[in-house]
Amino acid sequence: MVLAMLAWAGSFVSAKYLAMYINEHELVTYRYLITTSTTLPVLMYLNISYKIDLRNLAIAAITAILLVAYTKLFFLGTKIGTASFGGALITTLMPIIAFVIVLIFSKKKPIAKDWLALFIGAIGVSTMLEVWQFDLDEIFSTATVFFLWAATSWALMSVATAQSKSVSPILLSFYIYLIATLFNTVFFYENVSGSVFNMDAIFWVNILLMSIASTTFAATVYVAGMQRWGSKCTVFTFLVPFFVIILGAVFLGEAIQLSTIFGAMLTVSALMLINNISLKSLRS
């Protein structure tokens, strides 16, 4: 599980390298084509049928479109911003946004704990943005806007996939990747960067890491973890923002900002409140 979270964090660093080679439309097609191809052996190994009903297929289609949007937004944000900040902001903000969406559309009224969690989360995000230093134009720079919309897209994906019933999560993921590949290739893809087979080793290492390690591997391990440990598995996702910060410093030379670390800690605390996770349960 730790390796899976490390691989997911690595996707933000890989995006920074890939931005030097291809655009966002090419990235989506190449990434999810490889991911779709490498998910097939997983389905075969686990003996999972390819059959899916229309309801779950429709959910997969909606999620695929949101996935295309998320991937392009976080890629564009990382291209002009920093991978460490973007990764920390997105991975801590998206579950909070998902929680707010569920609160809005459900009949359940938020309790005091929920309001406290949202308040702590807001303080954490504000700390990462360093709102005390800039005016509004600087706070909501182009990169930050991309990251915020990316987090929102992923949150909507989480809400959509939660509606799926009686389907293997890995099978649902396979159709999401397949539809995302087809949708992007038909409507957006245009080869403007030349043949990928002429790209150097740096490109191939990063596209394979992003496609296989951070998507096929990480998603499969996470699903297996959820089946074995249930909701306790979510605690591992709290490692992602800190892994992103470390990887950004090691591979990209990005400065480690105390505001980013402290803000991530606050938002992780908010997520622990939302998920009813205590320090005692983490130790166990």
Give the positions of each predicted feature.
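Glycine-/small-residue-enriched transmembrane alpha-helix faces in small-molecule transporters
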Residues: 1-26, 65, 69, 73, ...
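Transmembrane alpha-helical segments that form core, pore/gating elements
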Residues: 13, 36-39, 97-104, 133-192
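Hydrophobic/aromatic residues within transmembrane alpha-helices
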Residues: 18, 27, 31, 77, ...
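Helix-helix packing/entry segments at the starts of transmembrane helices
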Residues: 28-30, 85-93, 160-181, 212-250
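Loop-to-transmembrane alpha-helix entry segments
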Residues: 53-57, 88-91, 107-127, 137-143, ...
